[in-house]
Amino acid sequence: MEEHRLGGGGGGGGGGGRPPIPGAAGRKLPGLSRHASFVRSPANSTKSGTEKTFENMDAVAYMPVVRSGGWADIGSRHTMEDVFICSDNLMKEFGVESFEDGPSAFYGVFDGHGGKHAADFVCSNLARFIVEDEDFPREIEKALSSAFLQTDAAFADACSVNSSLASGTTALAALVVGRSLLVANAGDCRAVLCCRGKAIEMSRDHKPSCNREKVRIEASGGYVYDGYLNGQLNVARAIGDWHMEGMKACDGLGPLSAEPEVMIRNLTEEDEFLIIGCDGIWDVFRSQNAVDFARRKLQEHNDPVTCCKELVDEAIKRKSGDNLSVVVICFNSRPPPVLTTPRPRVQRSISAEGLRELQSFLDSLAD
């Protein structure tokens, strides 16, 4: 099982601490260089949605209580290329003073391909690039997007030092700051929120055959063949893969993009938990099916770690053909409530003709 936990309770099975940056065959990698932000600043000074949320947070009574767990399994593959990370207290991990009441948590799943180096690298460094971004915490959405591209560029630098690191990974990260949930995705991992038993997808699968991605790929000089980007990759967005010819450009405008899509939601008392997982999970679980399964398990034992293991075990039973990794983040200390469905009120009506017939029948009884 592969897990990386940066502190906080409710972790997955084994291991702990921060994973090492991939070695360079006995050579020490240079310090990661910080590149200029790839995210353009808006021309006006309009405040971001997350900044407005923080200003008004004192007026909101609800505040989530986060606890998490994760689990991973090699599945039917011969090598393990998935990693995940759970940090229920991101600010404490990086020694940053909390700027708001409530949680400051970071979670991620990274599904490597062509080796595990890219997944390990992103798992080790993405959170740091977020926290150290000049726009954090004032504009978290912008900092989150920039951190993906910073990490991608830093991995390119690492690969230029040691070509054996060449590989790629999809990446999905979730931040819980106060009562704001931000999910950034590049690839085909998926995040699904359970809102009072209903599945709400917080990410979009980036497949080359998706019309929006296909248009972007072709505009960037690439093509889609048989569902594969340039006939080689079955994802349209990923970090790494700099070694693959024609995939990426230094300006970030190549067919294979590391820029994430970010979705934001203000959490309420009805939001129960979030599931983030690699495609090996979603190959055999529909989003609502996964929410229903996890909800039942949490009602039984209220343990996110055990819930993740049960999701992985069930995916293996359903013959998933990939590595498996999943993280469950609960937003309440209590288990999900049992939902009672009210009986529908049946409205009955009778026609005028039927009413006359009924009256005639009653009159006949009186006679």
Curated annotation (Swiss-Prot):
Keyword annotations for this protein, in alphabetical order, are: Hydrolase, Magnesium, Manganese, Metal-binding, Protein phosphatase
Residue positions annotated to bind Mn(2+) 1 are 111-112
Which residue windows does the record flag with biased composition (Gly residues)? 7-18
Q: How is the cofactor bound here?
A: Binds 2 magnesium or manganese ions per subunit.
Q: Which residues form the PPM-type phosphatase domain?
A: 67-331
The GO terms this record gives for MF are: metal ion binding; protein serine/threonine phosphatase activity
Q: What is its EC number?
A: 3.1.3.16
Q: Which GO terms describe its biological process?
A: regulation of defense response to virus; signal transduction
Q: Which family does it belong to?
A: Belongs to the PP2C family.
Q: Which PANTHER family match?
A: PROTEIN PHOSPHATASE 2C, PROTEIN PHOSPHATASE 2C 22-RELATED
Protein name (Swiss-Prot/TrEMBL): Probable protein phosphatase 2C 57
Which organism does this record belong to?
Answer: Oryza sativa subsp. japonica
Taxonomic placement: Eukaryota, Viridiplantae, Streptophyta, Embryophyta, Tracheophyta
